[in-house]
Amino acid sequence: MNDVFLKALPVLQKLTTAGFEAYFVGGSVRDYLLNRPISDVDIATSAFPEEVKEIFQSTYDTGIAHGTVTVRENKECYEVTTFRTEGTYEDFRRPSEVTFIRSLEEDLLRRDFTMNAIAMDENFKLHDPFSGQLAIQNKEIKAVGKASERFHEDALRMMRAVRFLSQLDFQLDKETETALTNQIALLQHTSVERITVEWIKMIKGQAVKRAIDLLLKVEMETYLPGFKGEKSALMEFASWNWEKRTTETAIWLGLVIAVKPSNITAFLKAWKLPNKTIQLVNKAYEAALNMKETWLTEELYHAQEAVFLLVNEINNIRGQSDKEDELKKAYELLPIHSKKDLAITGADLLKWTGENAGPWVKETLDKVECQVLLGKINNEKNQIKRWLGYHEE
């Protein structure tokens, strides 16, 4: 049995010893059955939140209104959630009310897909009332109960369906795909932040092209930031070798290259990305547009390492040769990597000339920077001074 489950087992045992039901649930059980890596576990129990808090010495109210208590056991933290049913979903995301219950099957009924509605008890016996194991065997993404109801409860589940297709290389069952097609407009009620998380996970998957093909088939792109009317661009994006991706930022640079938005910053801000990512993508896109077959010394210097490595990564994803090692070596061999590396400063210029500060200081340093970069003069104080026409000290 997986070590992650074994380490968390005492939590289940304490709950059952106290007379309650307790199970591992959700993605950890699914990934165990798929022989995929498991990073953490979720635990569901018939114990109500206050009862959970009485059983364990160290607890935190992380989501107690929805039945979740964080339990600290063996120096690890585990989210323990009470079995529950949910009322109507007024905003296509959150239930209007949550009712705590004692039934595992009723709790599993509210979950999104059958492969995520399998529970495992302390003896590692599986409880699978909705045939999630069969769906896994058939490589099928099938909604629990009526797909239309599950998508109406939380519209993000439609994006999750496409993401799971990419991650697992599964397919949607007929009813789930039909509901996805018919209810796709509900996605407009979902926050961009949640959509962005699913998009990134989708592109990190193993079946990106199939996922984007489905996304376009159901016209999901209409409800994603900056994608309306961009089917051909997304088809091009999907055709690239995304298995060669090593950074998340490459995903966004790839989108900018494919979609060619008139305002890159606005396009990326619509996805709620950090300013640091937006700035890096802007610089990398400009560098990619201006780059020739090989990087010139000046291009490497002005691009800086993060930029040229990102450009190299997207070029590799798009089918060009990987030049990362070559570029890193060339960058390391540059005589300087920024103006701060120059052997002289503005203070030196003022001292040597006796002049007042002014624009001429920056202009002179720019000239020196260029000459050092091109190897015309060494980055050595007296040599620079001689080149400028001043007497040596």
UniProtKB/Swiss-Prot annotation:
Its EC number is 2.7.7.72. The lineage of its organism: Bacteria, Bacillati, Bacillota, Bacilli, Bacillales. GO terms for biological process: RNA repair; tRNA 3'-terminal CCA addition. The keyword Nucleotide-binding applies. It catalyses: a tRNA precursor + 2 CTP + ATP = a tRNA with a 3' CCA end + 3 diphosphate; a tRNA with a 3' CCA end + 2 CTP + ATP = a tRNA with a 3' CCACCA end + 3 diphosphate. ATP binds at G27, R30, R111, D154, R157, R160, R163. This is CCA-adding enzyme. GO terms for molecular function: ATP binding; CCA tRNA nucleotidyltransferase activity; magnesium ion binding; tRNA binding. It comes from Listeria innocua serovar 6a (strain ATCC BAA-680 / CLIP 11262). The keyword ATP-binding applies. CTP binds at G27, R30, R111, D154, R157, R160, R163. SUPFAM superfamilies: Nucleotidyltransferase (SSF81301), Poly A polymerase C-terminal region-like (SSF81891). Mg(2+) binds at D40, D42. Homodimer. Catalyzes the addition and repair of the essential 3'-terminal CCA sequence in tRNAs without using a nucleic acid template. Adds these three nucleotides in the order of C, C, and A to the tRNA nucleotide-73, using CTP and ATP as substrates and producing inorganic pyrophosphate. tRNA 3'-terminal CCA addition is required both for tRNA processing and repair. Also involved in tRNA surveillance by mediating tandem CCA addition to generate a CCACCA at the 3' terminus of unstable tRNAs. While stable tRNAs receive only 3'-terminal CCA, unstable tRNAs are marked with CCACCA and rapidly degraded. Belongs to the tRNA nucleotidyltransferase/poly(A) polymerase family. Bacterial CCA-adding enzyme type 3 subfamily. Its cofactor is Mg(2+). A single active site specifically recognizes both ATP and CTP and is responsible for their addition. Keywords: ATP-binding, Magnesium, Metal-binding, Nucleotide-binding, Nucleotidyltransferase, RNA repair, RNA-binding, Transferase, tRNA processing. InterPro entries: Bact_CCA-adding_enz_type3_sf (IPR050264), CCA-adding_enz_C (IPR032810), CCA-adding_enz_firmicutes (IPR023068), NT_sf (IPR043519), PolA_pol_head_dom (IPR002646), PolyA_RNA-bd (IPR032828).
